Design a protein with these regions (language model features):
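Function-dense linear segments that define catalytic or interfacial modules
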Residues: 50-53, 99-128, 140-142, 147, ...
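Short hydrophobic/aromatic-enriched beta-strand-loop microsegments
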Residues: 92-99, 425
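Conserved "right-hand" nucleotidyltransferase catalytic core of DNA-directed polymerases
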Residues: 1-61, 71-80, 134-327, 336-341, ...
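Short helix/loop segment immediately N-terminal to the Walker
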Residues: 160, 167, 386-394
Length: 437
């Protein structure tokens, strides 16, 4: 709920001069601010500390001393992982991360605590404002430190009411520390390999451009949807299979172009150009910007972003390194192990095992107990063929159906994913639910 009226809190604080001013006999909350959203590239610019009675602002040069002192206390904070990275040589561990608790109660929360505070009626400065003004910074970090302290008991109470306190304590909080160590370790990435591949991609893009211009009969900006649309549908007269409003530009998204494959040889060249241009800008050139002085990429693992509880990755997204074709797979050569080996570990169909357990589906449980490939088993049942007769296409369809159902997909959404009629997709869903009630 957003209150009709916000409350301006006149919270007085003092600037800390001696760490012993903080009473560590009771619980202490703290909030640390960084000058960049990507905290791997940033530095600490201030800290707020609240001991239940007194509120302090801590200047950047005293933050590590204060954190060493606070190791003796029971502490609460917000975004412990960020703090652990910023305080890497302090090894600061807190007992309660407000960010994790709030996420479990509401997955739609935002990273900036000010959003939650303003929703609660507390007029707190947002991160963008804090960076502009020192007094705003001091107000922000102290207000946030006090808010973490004041709301901690309520969050714990609500977690217990929702039967999530055990998840919070025994899974999510230990995971924070694991992810912090992973982020600090980073992954080695070879700039020379990226540079070599970028140059190779640049040559191929130049050649593709010339071939495209040759078919078009003129030069134009291949990366401009407007110019490309005019070339394809006005100049070359290719069929446009979508209703176009007067004055609007032609759509040249992937679905439109893929529908024209085989109609004109320029289409395959444009699709290749697009894929290669994205590969070059996002990965071959883009990853270079994230390689720090230690030769490593330090991504940020987002523990509080997805609705499903999955981890995500940002700055850069290391979970989305392409692997569709040979050129894509070459990008992965740039990631080099420290000791000649990368270990890949993965749960075997963990989501579907959980689904089988919760739904008590006899067929799924039987398939897992027999160590069957669950997607092949489902494809066999849906298409009415033996497991040996299941094709790659059938298995791919079954996999899309299963995961689609797990995450609440509609017939329309599944149809789009599989590029089939929504009514046919709906029948797949109904057939699955009939076979695996």
């Amino acid at each position: 709920k957003i209150p009709k009226k916000q409350v301006k809190l006149d919270v007085s604080f003092k600037e800390l001069s001696d760490v012993h001013e903080i009473n560590i006999e009771k619980c202490v909350s703290y909030y640390i601010e960084c000058d960049k959203e990507n905290y791997h590239l940033g530095k600490i610019i201030g800290m707020g500390v609240y001991d239940g009675d007194n509120l302090f602002y801590v200047s950047p040069e005293k933050v590590k001393e204060v954190c060493e002192y606070l190791k003796q206390a029971v502490t609460y904070t917000y975004d412990l992982k960020k703090n652990m990275v910023l305080l890497k040589d302090v090894n600061m561990i807190s007992n309660f991360d407000h960010m994790i608790g709030a996420y479990l109660l509401n997955y739609q929360m935002k990273d900036d605590l000010a959003f939650m505070m303003n929703n609660d009626g507390i007029e707190a400065p947002f991160y963008s404002d804090i960076l502009k003004d020192e007094e705003m910074l001091k107000k922000g970090v102290t207000l946030k430190a006090k808010y973490v302290y004041d709301t901690r008991d309520d969050i714990v109470k609500r977690l217990k009411m929702d039967d999530m306190f055990d998840l919070f304590t025994n899974v999510e909080m230990p995971l924070v520390r694991v992810l912090a160590k992973m982020e600090l370790a980073g992954i080695r990435c070879d700039k020379d390999i990226l540079k070599e591949m970028s140059e190779e991609a640049g040559v191929r893009l130049d050649n593709l451009s010339r071939e495209i211009y040759n078919y078009a009969g003129c030069e134009f900006n291949v990366s401009s949807p407007k110019q490309l649309g005019n070339i394809l549908f006005d100049h070359l007269g290719l069929p446009y299979r979508k209703k176009k409003k007067d004055g609007a530009n032609y759509s040249t998204d992937a679905s439109i172009l893929e529908g024209l494959i085989g109609v004109h040889p320029i289409i395959e060249l444009i699709l290749e150009y697009r894929n290669l241009a994205k590969l070059k800008s996002t990965y071959l050139d883009g990853l270079n910007n994230y390689i720090l002085d230690d030769g490593r990429i330090h991504t940020i693992y987002k523990q509080t972003l997805t609705r499903t509880g999955r981890l995500s990755s940002a700055e850069p997204n290391l979970q989305n390194i392409p692997a569709r074709d040979e050129m894509d797979r070459k990008v992965r050569r740039a990631f080099v192990p420290e000791y000649d080996l990368f270990l890949s570990a993965d749960y075997s169909q963990i989501e579907l095992r959980v689904l089988a357990h919760i739904s008590n589906s006899e067929k799924m449980i039987e398939a897992f107990k027999n160590n069957e490939d669950i997607h092949t088993r489902v494809a066999s049942d849906i298409f009415g063929v033996s497991p040996e007769e299941v094709t790659k296409s059938m298995r791919r369809t079954a996999k899309a159906v299963i995961f689609g159902i797990v995450y609440g997909i509609s017939g329309f959404g599944l149809g789009e994913n599989l590029k089939i009629n929504p009514s046919d997709a709906k029948k797949f869903i109904e057939k699955y639910l009939e076979l695996y009630p």
